[in-house]
């Protein structure tokens, strides 16, 4: 991570940390870095979610892009993965999404995609940061015909919707409940599933600029659980603010998280011989039950650090086509370059239709172990050295010996906060409490500050 760019672009409280002035500079400098080798007039797609600050930041960002001669195609409100898809398929120099994903409405973010549809690598972000910190802006200042042209491009959303529909199968009146989080999916999810023939009940579809992710969406699926049961839906599909995540709800109102979604899709692809190297890429936070289910099916796994960017890096490096996170990021590389909640939803309903199985039947093949996560406040300098403290090492080893392979412990520093995270999984909640409490007592005694 750099000074401005975190693990998923530039984020902060809108108008205080992520200001219009910074958005202008990101447009100007980011656009220049990503298009400086173009032989023709560069084209950049810009999308946003429904936050009240979105249009303010979009106006500033677009002005910055236009100021270095870039033609800007405004996509309006649509999903983050739609920007990635359009960049890759329509030959743009880059794409920019204005969103803070699952964060509350007061936050916003700016995320860049390169011409290949992938998020920027560290080197490109470093180039942009160097220009942001330079004492003087020495970039070209074209005038007249050298300036960029602004084009409204609402048809981009229709193309994305049509593409997702083309990857699915007719649902023939299947009852589907949608929760679009009052966010980006509110402009597309209803249309996609209506075109597939589903009978719909939709919540979280009335954005007002302030209610994105507010008690709705993938981070708050409780309302959808009730709607699924009340409407008799076969499945509920909850997206986050920018629709790069999916959390599902089965016909009984039970949560089906990212681990289970990956397993269902992975097994389906494996049985068809379409799972690249018969491997799923996941992170260290995936549940032990998920790993055991993969082992039972003979499906391999590659494990990365937490964060969808690390999952994508491993997929690109090794040629895998399915990966994701427990939180609901699922990357289907055969279809798109980034996590796509609506794409995952289309594939999940397709599998239900083709197999004739309910979502609860498909998900029951993964027995999720009880999991507990505790965050302990520590000094930043100590969070990296925690595993070198003898008493902490000893208690972790002791707990792992007691587990005898039927559980898992993960102690890791937070990437963004002065926290040490202690997580355990075991067959019962009582065992999980025992393992986590025992370890956290030692950690607090040795290095904790709370």
Curated annotation (Swiss-Prot):
A single Gene Ontology CC term: cytosol
Keyword annotations from UniProtKB, A to Z: Isomerase, Magnesium, Metal-binding, Phosphoprotein
GO biological process, one term: carbohydrate metabolic process
Co-factor note (free text): Binds 1 Mg(2+) ion per subunit.
Active site: 101 (phosphoserine intermediate)
Annotated GO MF terms: magnesium ion binding; phosphoglucosamine mutase activity; phosphomannomutase activity
SUPFAM superfamilies: Phosphoglucomutase, C-terminal domain, Phosphoglucomutase, first 3 domains
Gene3D superfamilies in alphabetical order: Alpha-D-Glucose-1,6-Bisphosphate, subunit A, domain 3, Alpha-D-phosphohexomutase, C-terminal domain
S-S bonds: none
Cofactor (UniProt): Mg(2+)
Reaction it catalyzes: alpha-D-glucosamine 1-phosphate = D-glucosamine 6-phosphate
Entry comment on modification after translation: Activated by phosphorylation.
Keyword Isomerase assigned: yes
Enzyme Commission number(s): 5.4.2.10
Modified residues (Phosphoserine): 101
Record carries keyword Transport: no
List of residues binding Mg(2+): 101, 240, 242, 244
Top-level enzyme category: isomerase
Protein function: Catalyzes the conversion of glucosamine-6-phosphate to glucosamine-1-phosphate.
PANTHER family: PHOSPHOGLUCOMUTASE (ALPHA-D-GLUCOSE-1,6-BISPHOSPHATE-DEPENDENT), PHOSPHOHEXOSE MUTASE
HAMAP family, sorted: GlmM_B
Recorded family membership: Belongs to the phosphohexose mutase family.
Protein name per the record: Phosphoglucosamine mutase
Origin species: Streptococcus pneumoniae (strain 70585)
Name of the gene: glmM
